[in-house]
Amino acid sequence: MVKGKTKSGIAFELDERIKDDARLMYLLVKMQNATAPIEAGRAMNQLLALIFGDDDAAYAFMEEIASKHNGVCESEVMITELTEMLDAIKAKN
């Protein structure tokens, strides 16, 4: 497990094996290539559940972002936070 904190102060503990999971890349590509917002949203939800282990943990992550940003969890902010977390996993290895 990799523990850390993002620049905005969100604490995380993630399984470092996620970086080797082919589903991660699949879902990132699926999000990027989505032709409709609903497709991108569905892929994002699947990605969050994969990274955090379940829907409840993923939702708690989004709630924490919203609490730091006037009650809104903006997609760009969430992606920035996720990128920092995944970069921390890469840096460990």
Tell me the role of every PLM-derived stretch.
Residues 1-9:
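Short acidic-hydrophobic surface loop/beta-edge motif
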Residues 17-93:
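Short, surface-exposed, charged amphipathic helix/loop patches that serve as local interaction elements
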